[in-house]
Each structure stands twice: as C-alpha cells, then as structure tokens.
C-alpha cells in the first residue's frame, strides 16, 4: 500500500553499508503477517527497531506498541506522529540518508548490547500514557473546545 511507503524503507535498506545490511532481517507485520498480542510484544522486544515512514495516515498504533515494548522507533516527523512519538525518534520524512544514519546507530547499539531482548522502557510508556490516556484526551478535547469558542 503506497501510504505505508515500503518503497522508502527499501531505499533506506539498500543504502545501508553492506556489513549492516547483511545483518538486517525485515519483518513486515500487518496484512500478510498476523501475530497475537503476545507474539507482537515478543517480536518488538527482539527487534532492532520499528521503522514507521508513513506520511499519509493519522496516528498509528505500531509506534506506541513498539515504544511500550522497549523497541526503538524511527518515524517520519509529521504532525500526526509528533503528538505522541518523542522528538528524538523523528526524522525528516523524505531524507533517506538521515534514516540510514539512524538505522546504523541503532544497529551499532543493538550489537554492543549483544542483541538481547529489550525490556519495556518505562519513560516511553509514561510518555505514551500521558498522551493517550482518557484523562489526556479529555484535556486535549477541552482545550480544543475552549480555543474554538474564543
């Protein structure tokens, strides 16, 4: 599906240094690969990163799920994404080399850590919860209504 921008991911992967590209094993979870909740968490905890280059859809749950599982997220810097995804995880949507550089950095950190499963990152869970909890959504709606009535 074009809005997922898998062609962009292919451009990033084919632009990686060979020694990094040889270590990369892509898993496209979604329409073709269905996982239970437990399998999804395990896959994310064993993944080097979640790449989320989409530029034409609203907020996506995969980054929130990945962050909750402790998986690093690399996402396109767009308004729908930057409401929840921390700035350090956002890259220019069309800059292949910025994505290549970030994948190389994440891969190096993964290798230094011995490729062990990741643990949930409490700071990212708190970040997502603060953005997506019913209380946070209620405050955002109240603010939007207040602004609309001014």
What do the predicted segments below correspond to?
Residues 1-34:
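Conserved catalytic-core segment of nucleotide-activated headgroup transferases in glycan assembly
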Residues 41, 64-68, 79-83:
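Short alpha-helical segment that forms part of, or immediately flanks, the ligand-binding pocket
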Residues 42-47:
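Short alpha-helical donor nucleotide-sugar binding micro-motif in glycosyltransferases
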Residues 55:
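Aromatic "clamp/platform" in nucleotide-sugar-dependent glycosyltransferases that forms part
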Residues 72-75:
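Short hydrophobic beta-strand element within catalytic cores of glycosyltransferases
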Residues 89-97, 104-114:
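Conserved acidic donor-binding segment of nucleotide-sugar-dependent glycosyltransferases
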Residues 114-149:
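A charged, aromatic-enriched C-terminal amphipathic alpha-helix characteristic of glycosyltransferases
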């Amino acid at each position: 599906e074009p809005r997922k921008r898998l062609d962009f991911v292919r451009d990033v992967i084919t632009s990686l240094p060979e020694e990094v590209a040889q270590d990369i094993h892509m898993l496209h979870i979604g329409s073709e690969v269905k996982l239970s909740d437990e399998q999804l968490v395990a896959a994310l905890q064993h993944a080097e990163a979640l790449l989320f280059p989409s530029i034409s859809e609203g907020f996506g749950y995969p980054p929130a799920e990945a962050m909750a599982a402790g998986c690093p997220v690399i996402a396109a810097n767009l308004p729908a994404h930057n409401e929840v995804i921390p700035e350090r995880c956002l890259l220019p949507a069309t800059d292949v080399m910025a994505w290549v550089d970030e994948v190389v950095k994440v891969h190096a950190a993964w290798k230094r850590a011995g490729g062990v499963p990741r643990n949930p990152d409490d700071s990212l869970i708190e970040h997502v919860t603060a953005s997506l909890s019913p209380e946070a959504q209620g405050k955002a709606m109240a603010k939007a209504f207040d602004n609309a009535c001014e």
